[in-house]
């Protein structure tokens, strides 16, 4: 059973109905509004300086968020392990950002992020690691006045600029935007690794660790989603990661109806090459039984 855990009593309820139950528990690492009020520089921020008001969001680059909510995650794992049915838990899915699927909030609406002070500082640190010197950065960005301590996140206009269709040319000033998107993708995976390592440490590696992630197909339906989303480092960094057992995602929201193939968000079979699993979740909610049966048959056949 995949269960979005909000109360440990949920484990007991499922076991009462299914005495053989085993669980993948789903949790998230969203901060509280109070935490954001105490850490304003760590709050996820759009290009115009505004913050998200519909849900509390810390910058993925915030080290303080990683530390504080890593400890909350550690406490949750310990509580599960000490619960009477805790031995039935076999893994944990850790979610964050849009729908818990680790792509940046505002991606679907083309809202430019993350311009928070902590993200600017993290971007500069990433650039310093890549370029080492001001001269190397200036040459790559074709920007004679930029320095490692003063580099800024590209503006929305810079992020929209392309040279050939939707492609960017790394031999031009496009490199600034290329660097930023690589950085943003790296930060997501760095954060994921931080939280996974806590789970593996507390469970001595007994639990599977996974995320909704790796949407190489689904986030490529529009070029801006591929860039803004932050998933595109998964082939470079998630494949073969020793702390990532599985990735997950719903079936594609294209071609998922009766008689349609139910395609994947990700490069599904690539994960198997690295001895990793991919969990396909069907979040279709048909109202008619024949449709439900047809979709179940299609999904089962697709996995064979």
Q: Which residues fall in each region the model found?
A:
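N-terminal substrate-binding region of glycoside hydrolase catalytic domains
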Residues: 1-70, 248
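Catalytic-core region of carbohydrate-active enzymes that cleave or remodel glycosidic bonds
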Residues: 193-209, 229-304
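Amphipathic alpha-helical segments in well-structured domains
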Residues: 7-11, 73, 116, 120, ...
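A cross-family glycoside hydrolase active-site/sugar-binding cleft signature
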Residues: 1, 24-28, 93-95, 210-213, ...
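Short amphipathic alpha-helices and their capping/turn segments at secondary-structure boundaries
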Residues: 8-18, 77-84, 234-236, 264-272
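Alpha-helix N-cap and loop-to-helix initiation/capping positions
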Residues: 2-6, 64-68, 183, 187, ...
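Extracytoplasmic/secreted cell-surface and envelope-processing proteins
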Residues: 33-35, 102-103, 256-259
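Polysaccharide-binding and catalytic clefts of secreted carbohydrate-active enzymes
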Residues: 42-240, 244-253
